[in-house]
Regions:
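Carrier-protein-dependent adenylate-forming modules in NRPS/ANL systems
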Residues: 1-169, 182-183, 208, 212
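Conserved AMP-binding/adenylation subdomain of ANL enzymes
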Residues: 162-189, 199-225
């Protein structure tokens, strides 16, 4: 095991029609996640450089396909909350120096303002493109377990956002240990409360891919006033 995409592909082969990520009124199956992610990966495959691709997208199932699609493209992803104060977003982008920005339609205008010469892609359009399996296979052959998987920005003890880089290997070790301790199996259903750009959401994203279980994105109004 050297890549988190192996989890997705293995679970999809066993549970293709099972809902893996759910919202209040929407759900997406393992097969749908796989197909959408590969389409996104194909669109982003020609992005130049090795810098992460920034993601600005809402708290919804499509955002997770954006993350995985970036992984298929051979890049690390870096989620950014489009509702943060603009000066904090500017600091994150300046620190990250992304190779591209992938944004949903609600955040596309913001992404274009931030781009400053780098390509911007609309998530909804990328999900409708055609998969180039040969191109994705070539990218996968060149990936190794120590490749960066994601960069998540914390608030920072000084108040300045700081990016924390995690590799495929580190994430795989963590998730496997977590699942072992918590005794999670394919019959379980996780509840996601954390924003998808927070480190705490990592379990809710990757445990289902590893074990074939499901994760529900709980509406904020259910647990916040």
């Amino acid at each position: 095991m050297k890549n988190v995409l192996e989890w997705l592909e293995a679970s999809e082969s066993v549970y293709p029609d099972k809902a893996v990520y759910l919202e209040d009124t929407k759900e997406i199956t393992f097969h749908e996640v796989l197909c959408a992610s590969q389409k996104i990966g194909t669109v982003l495959a020609d992005v130049k450089g090795t810098a992460p691709i920034a993601v600005i997208s809402g708290r919804k199932v499509e955002t997770i396909t954006a993350y995985l699609g970036i992984v298929y493209s051979g890049h690390a992803y870096a989620p950014i909350d489009g509702k943060l104060p603009r000066h904090r977003i500017d600091i994150i982008v300046e620190t990250l120096k992304p190779s591209a920005i992938l944004a949903d339609s609600d955040n596309l205008a913001l992404a274009e303002e931030l781009a400053q010469g780098i390509p911007v892609f609309e998530l909804e359009k990328a999900m409708q493109e055609t998969t180039d399996a040969k191109k994705l296979q070539e990218i996968r052959r060149n990936m190794i377990m120590t490749d960066p998987l994601y960069v998540i920005f914390t608030s920072g003890s000084t108040g300045k956002p700081k990016g924390v880089i995690t590799s495929h290997q580190s994430l795989i070790c963590y998730i496997e240990s977590y699942v072992s301790v918590m005794k999670i199996d394919e019959n379980d259903r996780l509840g996601n409360q954390s924003p998808l750009d927070y480190i705490a959401a990592i379990r809710d994203i990757y445990v289902p891919l590893y074990k074939g279980c499901s994760s529900v994105i709980i509406p904020k109004e259910y647990f916040m006033e």
